[in-house]
């Protein structure tokens, strides 16, 4: 089926309407010169009728209709990883990140966008969607909650992570939990004892740093606290690399992967 542009193009190349070949035929009494001049005339008409898209890339761009923005842009978008898929090895493998980020997180984004349509939370911030849908819309909450958790999870890790904790954050942890060693011990224990899928957390509640845990896609947001560090203990997060050794995974995370600068950034936001 031809488009209007194609039809115009065909007419211009054929010559006068309803007489496709007539303009190309010289009459018996025409001179060669007149035949040549008529040929030039037909060629000029044909060239004038060819649409702009047959020309340069600039002509194409000038004649292409502008892309219209979505009337309601998607609220959830899969972020790029802030490092290469193999950058966290040997503590988290390339294969784990390919499955975890590229497949599992993408599924939360896709499902979340579909479930968000037509709800009262459409167009609201991710944090508002998570808090608002909790206890009211389980399907939306599960996917929005996991999207929120993973948006930060990728930033809570970095190559050559772990190491020294920034001073202000270190003091807040010591004031809230007792010591850095105790915080790490309780954090690992929270993850190990989380039955089934879930997360373990450092969070700020009432101005104090606490260690806590949550099931499935829940987070401290739904209990009135603000998360500043979280570790995913769903099996897809560690089973390729650690099999059933969840404690080893949690120890590797807290000692070798944590991006304490980002944790500090979230802490500063939480106490404002």
Segments from the language model and where they lie:
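N-terminal export signals
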Residues: 18-21, 28-29, 35-56
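Early transmembrane hairpin module of multi-pass membrane proteins
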Residues: 87, 93-122
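All-alpha RGS (Regulator of G-protein Signaling) helical domain and cognate RGS-like helical scaffolds
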Residues: 103, 114-123, 132-205, 210-211
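C-terminal segment of N-terminal export signals and the immediately downstream linker at the start
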Residues: 51-88
């Amino acid at each position: 089926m031809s488009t209007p542009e194609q039809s115009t193009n065909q007419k211009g190349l054929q010559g006068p309407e309803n007489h496709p070949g007539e303009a190309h035929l010289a009459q018996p009494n025409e001179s060669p010169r007149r035949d040549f001049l008529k040929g030039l005339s037909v060629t000029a008409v044909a060239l004038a009728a060819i649409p702009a898209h047959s020309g340069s890339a600039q002509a194409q761009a000038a004649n292409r209709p502008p892309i219209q923005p979505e009337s309601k842009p998607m609220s959830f978008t899969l972020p790029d990883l802030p490092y290469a898929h193999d950058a966290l090895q040997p503590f988290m493998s390339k294969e784990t990140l390919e499955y975890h980020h590229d497949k599992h997180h993408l599924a939360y984004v896709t499902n979340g966008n579909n479930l968000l349509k037509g709800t009262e939370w459409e167009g609201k911030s991710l944090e508002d969607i998570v808090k608002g849908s909790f206890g009211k819309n389980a399907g939306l909450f599960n996917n929005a909650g996991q999207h929120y958790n993973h948006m930060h999870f990728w930033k809570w890790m970095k190559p050559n992570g772990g190491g020294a904790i920034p001073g202000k954050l270190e003091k807040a942890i010591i004031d809230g939990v007792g010591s850095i060693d105790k915080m790490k011990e309780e954090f690992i224990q929270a993850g190990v004892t989380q039955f089934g899928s879930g997360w373990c957390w450092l969070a700020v509640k009432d101005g104090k740093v606490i260690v806590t845990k949550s099931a499935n896609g829940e987070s401290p947001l739904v209990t009135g606290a603000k998360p500043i560090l979280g570790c995913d203990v769903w099996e897809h997060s560690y089973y390729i690399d650690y099999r059933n050794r969840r404690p080893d995974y949690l120890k590797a995370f807290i000692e070798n992967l944590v991006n304490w600068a980002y944790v500090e950034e979230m802490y500063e936001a939480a106490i404002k």
